[in-house]
Amino acid sequence: MTWELIAQLTFLTSIIVSGPLVIALLAIRKGNL
C-alpha cells in the first residue's frame, strides 16, 4: 500500500460518505423552510 493509493482511497471514501450527508442536510433545510 503506497501513500498515494491510501490518499486516493480516503479521498474517494470521504466523497462517498459526504455525498448522502450533504443531500440530507439540504433536505432538512428545505423541510425547515
Swiss-Prot record:
Q: Which gene name does the record give?
A: psb30
Give the membrane topology: Single-pass membrane protein
Q: Which residues cross the membrane?
A: 5-25
Protein name, per record:
Photosystem II reaction center protein Psb30
Family named by the database record: Belongs to the Psb30/Ycf12 family.
Q: What is its main location?
A: plastid
The record describes the protein's role as:
A core subunit of photosystem II (PSII), probably helps stabilize the reaction center.
| GO (cellular component) term, any one | chloroplast thylakoid membrane
For this entry, list what GO says about its biological process: photosynthesis
Self-association or partners: how does it assemble? PSII is composed of 1 copy each of membrane proteins PsbA, PsbB, PsbC, PsbD, PsbE, PsbF, PsbH, PsbI, PsbJ, PsbK, PsbL, PsbM, PsbT, PsbX, PsbY, PsbZ, Psb30/Ycf12, peripheral proteins of the oxygen-evolving complex and a large number of cofactors. It forms dimeric complexes.
**Which InterPro entries does the entry link to?**
Profilin_CS, PSII_Ycf12_core-subunit
Q: Which GO terms describe its molecular function?
A: actin binding
Keywords of this entry: Chloroplast, Membrane, Photosynthesis, Photosystem II, Plastid, Thylakoid, Transmembrane, Transmembrane helix
Superkingdom of this protein's organism:
Eukaryota
In terms of NCBIfam families, this protein maps to: PRK13686.1
Pfam families, from UniProt?
A: PSII_Ycf12
Give the disulfide map.
Answer: none
